C-alpha cells in the first residue's frame, strides 16, 4: 500500500489498513543546514512532484499544506485529494522541531474543512518530515511514517508556492545528491487535482 493511503488510514480508516507497507525509510536523508525557518514555515506549499518509495504504489494524490513554527513546535494544516476516488481529506499536525531546525516528528488529527476535529491523533502512529533543501519558492522534503516508533514507509516530495511550477536548479541538485531522478516522480499538474486553499488560508490567520 502506498504511503499516502497509509497516512490517511492512520487517521481516517482502520489502522489495519496499513498492513503491507514496504518497511524501513530511506537512510540517506540529511536535514538542510541553516534552514530559513521564517520562510519555510509560512504560506502554503503545494506538492508538484512526489515519489512514493513503495514500488506497488498505484493510487494518485495531490497534497498541499501550511506549516507554522513557534517556540520549537510545528503546527500545520494538511490537505490531501485522492485523484482516483475524488475524495478530500483534512488534517492538522503538531510536533516538536528538532535542534537542527529542519526536521520534525508529528501526530495528526482528522478535521473537517472548517478545522473542527473529527478524530484525535492515534498515539501509535507518527510521521517525520525532513527538509532536505529549500530555495526561494521551491523545496524538497522527505516524509517517513512510523508505527510505535518503527519505520513503515516513506516518500520524497518536491514543493513549490506555485502548484504548477517546476523545481529550480538547487532542488534538482539536491535530488541528485540523494540519487533520485525527477523523471521517476509523479507530476501532480498532470493529475486532475483539486485544492482547498480556503482551508489552508484559514489556518494562517
Swiss-Prot record:
This is Nitrophorin-7. InterPro entries: Calycin, Nitrophorin, Nitrophorin_domain. Disulfide bonds join 25-144, 62-193. Belongs to the calycin superfamily. Nitrophorin family. It catalyses: 3 nitrite + 2 H(+) = 2 nitric oxide + nitrate + H2O. Changing residue 47 to V: Results in the loss of the characteristic pH sensitivity of ligand binding. Reverses orientation of heme cofactor. One of its GO terms (cellular component) is extracellular region. Heme binds at residues 80, 91. Forms oligomers (at pH 5.5). GO terms for biological process: modulation of process of another organism; vasodilation; venom-mediated perturbation of biological process. Optimum pH is 7.5. The lineage of its organism: Eukaryota, Metazoa, Ecdysozoa, Arthropoda, Hexapoda. It comes from Rhodnius prolixus (Triatomid bug). GO terms for molecular function: histamine binding; metal ion binding; nitric oxide binding; oxidoreductase activity; toxin activity. Expressed in the endothelial cells of the salivary glands. Its main location: secreted. Keywords: Disulfide bond, Heme, Hemostasis impairing toxin, Iron, Metal-binding, Oxidoreductase, Platelet aggregation inhibiting toxin, Secreted, Signal, Toxin, Vasoactive, Vasodilator.
Amino acid at each position: 500500500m502506498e504511503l499516502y493511503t497509509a497516512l490517511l488510514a492512520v487517521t481516517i480508516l482502520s489502522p489495519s489498513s496499513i498492513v503491507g507497507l514496504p518497511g524501513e525509510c530511506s537512510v540517506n536523508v540529511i536535514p538542510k543546514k541553516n534552514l530559513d525557518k521564517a520562510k519555510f514555515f509560512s504560506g502554503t506549499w503545494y506538492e508538484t512532484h512526489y515519489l512514493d518509495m513503495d514500488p506497488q504504489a498505484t493510487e494518485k494524490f495531490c497534497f498541499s499544506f501550511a506549516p507554522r513554527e513557534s517556540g520549537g513546535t510545528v503546527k500545520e494544516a494538511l490537505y490531501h485529494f485522492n485523484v482516483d476516488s475524488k475524495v478530500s481529506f483534512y488534517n492538522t499536525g503538531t510536533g516538536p522541531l528538532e535542534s537542527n531546525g529542519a526536521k520534525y516528528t508529528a501526530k495528526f488529527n482528522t478535521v473537517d474543512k472548517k478545522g473542527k476535529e473529527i478524530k484525535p491523533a492515534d498515539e501509535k502512529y507518527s510521521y517525520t518530515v525532513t527538509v532536505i533543501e529549500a530555495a526561494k519558492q521551491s523545496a524538497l522534503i522527505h516524509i517517513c511514517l512510523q508505527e510505535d516508533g518503527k519505520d513503515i514507509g516513506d516518500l520524497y516530495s518536491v514543493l513549490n508556492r506555485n502548484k504548477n511550477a517546476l523545481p529550480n536548479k538547487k532542488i534538482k541538485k539536491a535530488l541528485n545528491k540523494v540519487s533520485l531522478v525527477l523523471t521517476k516522480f509523479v507530476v501532480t499538474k498532470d493529475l486532475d487535482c483539486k485544492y482547498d486553499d480556503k482551508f489552508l488560508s484559514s489556518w494562517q490567520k
